[in-house]
Design a protein with these regions (language model features):
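ATP-binding/phosphotransfer module of carbohydrate and carboxylate kinases, centering on a glycine-rich
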Residues: 1-61, 72-74, 97-100, 118-124, ...
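Phosphate-binding/catalytic loop of phosphoryl-transfer enzymes
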Residues: 9, 21, 61-63, 69-172, ...
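Short loop/turn microsegments at loop-to-beta-strand junctions
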Residues: 2, 14, 66, 136-137
Length: 298
């Protein structure tokens, strides 16, 4: 059976795994990602060099999941998120020449969708989507049984969606800031007066699960906003199912509140007075959480 080296490049760490062709993880670890504010592309490639050298004689190829708008055919990065030093580079081609083996590159949100479509919560669907609640809101879209990338590789870049038409010049008006995990932290901090950076998913849901009424109220505000965008996404694409991913999606309380918020949206739609039918999105959790990008990249 053939083995591959798969990277999931994030802003803080780059995870990697030795995987077989059935996406079974044989070994897994991570290395720090060089800071884009002080480091260069060559610094990042040097980090990859160290990992590749470790597995060079055991792999048939390399697959990479990374942020940004990119062309999966050659790995050209229009943007690269927190790996800004890779923007404008044809990463797939460059690394293939560097290591002498095939290298594929795909957007991280699209990798999550591919993983769920291959072996997870979207398996067997014709039209579906993944919404990943991370630092921002990422994801991917499956249409007619295939990953939909769009003409400019931006399909599924939900963070760019404007959610407040009255304030399009403010960052808080975009889905990426107000509905990612950081968005939830910002909502809570706004009402407590604390620095939002003191809140992470574990702290927020620790308080929520302990019955903190203030945190529960802010969680409801967060899921109300998220539910509206999920409703809109389903209206645009008429999907079989929408899978919610990201670290905080592992919290049962989030799914409970999100489903409740979505039910309220559907119950209160005034269009029911005109038409008895209103499209109702079906949501579920992603099957693969932290490993989704690794599996989808393969």
């Amino acid at each position: 059976m053939k083995n591959y080296l798969v990277f999931d490049a994030g802003g803080t760490f780059t995870k990697y795994a030795l995987m077989d062709e059935n996406a079974e993880i044989l070994e897994k670890d991570k290395v720090p990602t060089p800071d884009y504010r002080t480091k260069t592309k060559e610094d990042y490639y040097a980090v990859l060099d160290g990992v590749v050298e470790k597995y060079r004689n055991r792999i048939e190829g390399i697959a990479i999941s990374m942020p940004g708008m990119l062309d999966n055919k050659d790995g050209y990065c229009v943007t690269a998120g927190y790996l800004a030093y890779l923007a404008g580079s044809t990463v797939g081609t460059e690394l293939s020449k560097r290591y002498g083996i095939p290298v594929s590159v795909e957007n991280d949100g699209k990798c999550a969708a591919l993983a769920e479509f291959w072996r997870g919560s979207l398996k067997g669907c014709t039209n579906g989507a993944v919404v990943v609640l991370g630092s921002g809101v990422a994801g991917g879209i499956i249409l007619n049984g295939k990953l939909f990338r769009g003409n400019h590789f931006t399909a599924g870049e939900y963070s760019y969606v404007c959610t407040d038409a009255k304030k399009p010049a403010e960052m808080e008006s975009y889905w990426g800031l107000n509905s990612g995990a950081e968005g939830l932290a910002r909502i809570i901090a706004k009402h407590t007066g604390e620095n939002w950076q003191t809140y992470d998913g574990l702290k927020i849901f620790g308080l929520a699960n302990d019955g903190d009424e203030k945190v529960l109220a802010e969680l409801k505000e967060y899921t109300d906003s998220l539910a509206v965008q999920i409703y809109n996404l389903n209206i645009y694409l008429d999907l079989d199912i929408i899978a919610i991913g990201g670290g905080i999606s592992q919290q049962p309380l989030l799914h409970k509140y999100l489903q409740r918020s979505l039910d309220e949206v559907l119950e209160n739609i005034p269009l029911r007075k005109i038409s008895p039918y209103v499209p109702e999105p079906k949501i579920t959790n992603c099957r693969f959480y932290n490993d989704a990008n690794l599996i989808g990249a393969l």
